[in-house]
Amino acid sequence: MRVLLGIHLPRLPLDVCAPPPSDAEAGAAGCAVLEQGVVLIADAPARRHGVRAGMKRGGVLTLAPGTRLVERDPAREADALRAVALALLRFSPCVALDDEATLIVDVGPSLRLFGGLPSLCRQVRATLAALGYAARLSAAPTGRGAWLLARTSARARVRRRVARPASLGRTLDRLPCVLLPDARPYAGWLDGLGCRTLADLRALPRAGLQRRCGPALLAALDRAYGDALEPLAWMTVPPVFDVRLELPERVEYAQAVLFAAQRLVVQLCGWLAARQLSLAAMTFDLEHERGRQAVPPTALELAFAAPVRDEAHFMRLLGERLARVELPAAVIAVRLKATRVESVEPPADDLFPEPGGTRETRARLFELLSARLGADNVLRAARVADHRPEAANRWLPLDAQAGKAAAGPPDAPPRPAWLLAEPLPLLMRGERPVFHTPLRMMSSAERIEGGWFDGQHVARDYHVAHDEAGACYWVFLERSESAAEPRWFLHGLFG
């Protein structure tokens, strides 16, 4: 079943130019966007002061002098639409940028994956909300039909989600004909004919309509109703992810950048889904003011123990890292770059989940701990080529390279699960060492000698020993020519 989603951003000119929410909440008179000296759209505070679309600049200044007036910025709107399209790639690789702040997404093959159309629409709205945009959503079997339904006024009593072609025709028939861009130049002529809806427009003789209005109007009608093929220019996914976002105001604290970071992370997740990649490392730059006292960007480099593509995990790590950053200057822009990516591994085919979580789950936990506590405070053990048990390993940060792992001795006797920080001297009872009870040797001696090269020379004979309760210990006899009596030590406990 072919289902295309129409996504219209009715406030886009205002969203890319409006002042920060804190200014509006402080009681400002609001903001209005002008195009050629005429109000295109105004926010709620400006409307409360009487500002309406279509008013001229002079009328606005007379009615509400405190209203902030900004010129429409088509370049910023185009950038915002591309950012939304990039984020929507997580739902489908087929995303098209259309006219009048509207996007078309082919979600037919993705419906089952996202739990059906209602669930998919909820997830799309959540993605758009994370980007800071409100939207009107529609669904139809044709792209132009979805576009028309999404562009319908919020006050119109029209069903915006239509799955069957037959239902689409009946729904489109009720829409005003001037909603179709190709019909707007002829709005006066059509109104004079009493032609107000798309049904009225389709009822006109096609030959006469083509002579009067040209072939483009009929072609647009046919594409909307599914009577003609409609070519859609799907977005090309960029080969690399490197996105910069300017902040609406100067930010003095690192954690205040999180909202902007989320907008970039949402786009990153869409890009990863479209490219079928997982992220192994990324760089998040905080750009400061330029000029005579310019400060280089504050760069946060994040590397992951295992490649990931989870938005929540990215945000947790960024939040922990930003909480520990002291800014040298105010932030005016942020930039996110995927520096290392890997192909997505196929899902595991295990019937039952792995006890204790998967390798990816554990890796995410370690990354979160490193971000919160600092990389130098979360360590892992690495083997060292040394026969002495107390020197056979070292502690390294999680992301440190340990080099080639040291190989243990071939056919080495069993080693205890727990090694004491310092060997514990044992008392003697007769010829047997005692730890709670006399110990009985259960293995032959394993001689370990080394350390002459660093001044920590040891010479020991290790044994596995049992006490009377059956507990298992790792003990050694110190080999020393100067000792008058044998000296035994406890060095490890078996589990």
Regions found by a protein language model. Name each.
Residues 140-148, 278-290, 331-342, 380-395:
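A glycine-rich phosphate-binding loop feature that marks nucleotide/adenosyl-phosphate handling sites
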